[in-house]
């Protein structure tokens, strides 16, 4: 759905980030290199500049004219991309969580004296088990995620199947699949599906069952 948010949680190495990247490549037709630009990797020392963007350096050095007398903001790819991934979200400091809260809650960001309404996006976040490097997520921040799905490790039979896979498939250009699929069109179709009051209650029940 438009502005859909989902958190994937589970053990280390369970494929949460890989799944998020593959889905982005499929639905937004992004290359391996471009999908990496859409990822914000959680870290306790993340600054506002690393999350949102920075002032135009060319303007600061006088090599480019100001925009109506003001310095322009060069927004990071994470901010402007249609597909966003926050990797290891529980490594974000409370400060970083507050910066991202307006993005998730209102679809807008602000840096320096400029703000921007973020284009429609889909956001996935990954959550690993607690350790010494993790930070507790605030309740308002967690509440901005519509769904939280557990990602379990493969069982023995699944590991055996994975081990037998043709290694040449690792070089597949995932972005070339589903070429006829347009994410915005799918979201519009979903938005216009009619449903009864009973169906809405059932959907809300399912969503409530998959929240942190």
Question: Which residue ranges define each predicted feature?
Answer:
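Short helix/loop segment immediately N-terminal to the Walker
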Residues: 66-69, 73, 112-115, 212
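Basic, amphipathic alpha-helical bundle interface domains used for macromolecular binding and assembly
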Residues: 166-212
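Canonical AAA+ ATPase core
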Residues: 6, 18-21, 27-30, 58-64, ...
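Short glycine-rich substrate-engagement loop in P-loop NTPases that contacts/grips substrate
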Residues: 43-79
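Walker A/P-loop
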Residues: 2-43
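Short hinge/gating elements
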Residues: 7-10, 82-83, 127-130, 149, ...
């Amino acid at each position: 759905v438009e502005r859909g948010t989902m958190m994937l949680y589970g053990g280390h190495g369970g494929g949460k980030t890989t799944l998020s990247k593959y889905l982005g490549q499929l639905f937004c037709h992004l290359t391996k290199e471009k999908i990496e630009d859409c990822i914000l990797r959680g870290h306790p020392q993340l600054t506002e500049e690393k999350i949102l963007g920075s002032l135009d350096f060319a303007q600061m050095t006088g090599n480019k004219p100001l925009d109506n007398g003001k310095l322009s903001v060069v927004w990071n790819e994470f901010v402007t991309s249609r597909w966003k991934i926050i990797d290891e979200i529980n490594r974000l400091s409370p400060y970083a969580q507050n910066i991202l809260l307006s993005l998730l809650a209102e679809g807008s960001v602000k840096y320096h004296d400029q703000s921007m309404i973020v284009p429609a996006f889909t956001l996935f976040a990954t959550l690993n088990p607690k350790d010494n490097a993790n930070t507790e997520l605030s309740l308002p921040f967690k509440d901005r995620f519509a769904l939280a799905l557990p990602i379990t490790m493969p069982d023995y039979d699944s590991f055996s199947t994975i081990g037998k896979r043709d290694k040449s498939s690792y070089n597949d250009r995932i972005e070339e699949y589903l070429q006829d699929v347009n994410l915005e069109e799918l979201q519009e179709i979903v938005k216009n599906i009619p449903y009864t009051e009973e169906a809405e209650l059932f959907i809300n029940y399912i969503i409530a069952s998959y929240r942190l």
